[in-house]
Amino acid sequence: TLFRSAELFNRAAKGVRLTLAGEQFLVDCQAVLAMLEQACNNVRAVESGQKGVLKLGATMYASYSVVPHVAIQHRDTYSDVELHFQEMVPSDLHAALQDGRLDAAISFSETATPGIHSLVLLREPLIAALPANHPQVQSEHFRLESLSDDPFITVPRQSAPMLYDSILHQCLKAGFSPQIGLEASVQQTVMNFVARGVGVALIPASMENAQLRGVVYRRLENPNMVENMLMWSTKNKNPALPGFVNLCRSIRDKLDAAQSGRIND
């Protein structure tokens, strides 16, 4: 016997037979071996990036363009890797990448940062957002310079410098410097102010997907392009990150096609 208090098997003339205690011990041992095998499989899966957690941050604006495509494709490809998503303003995304709170981030393009890799996922044009009662809504041939006397609602430059500069440059191309009436760090807030008639705005085209009542969108001549970029730290050691980056790289063409189709409608 293996235990002083329990008989696991009985010896008889015809051989050895398990006792009831022995049968239970066998079942438990088989379960332990199965758990050990599963634990080894889990370790291999995590190490290879097939299982685990990936922390993704993005601007609220990206939730109307890139993030849904990426999230669906990731779910279908890496079902055992949990995607934890968090919305932040662009300046906070960079800090979270550098201190390890995020594994990857999707935001507007920025100047090169040491230790941060980037990949362009989508390029889309700026469009004008006007209150529904704005006089230019009825204009057959909309021109940006017609808004030169309107207050503009835009993001603060310190929050999204590339987007701010693109908006400013678009107005300068049209022959005027915009009157900044109000600044808001979140694109949805910018849109809400437009809907209330506080001012007008230039926004990335995918924000039209917000379908906000009280806002009318107009295309621009020769619009500046805004880039959605995937960013990640070179110091990040999450095994799930390389697969996520490759997945994002593989769906860039789909994102461009989806955006082109929407703009041309």
Enumerate the predicted regions with their spans.
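Secondary-structure junction motif
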Residues: 152-174, 238-243, 252-261
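Beta-alpha-beta core module
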Residues: 114-120, 124-125, 136, 188-235
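Hydrophobic hinge/microswitch elements
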Residues: 89-102, 107-108, 157-215
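Flexible hinge/capping segments at coil-to-helix
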Residues: 116-126, 130-152, 234, 239-242
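Alpha-helical linker/hinge and terminal dimerization helices associated
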Residues: 3-6, 25-47
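A late-sequence structural motif
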Residues: 66, 215-260
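A short LG(V/I)-centered, amphipathic sequence patch enriched
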Residues: 3-18
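Central regulatory/effector-binding core of bacterial HTH transcription factors
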Residues: 51-114, 182-184
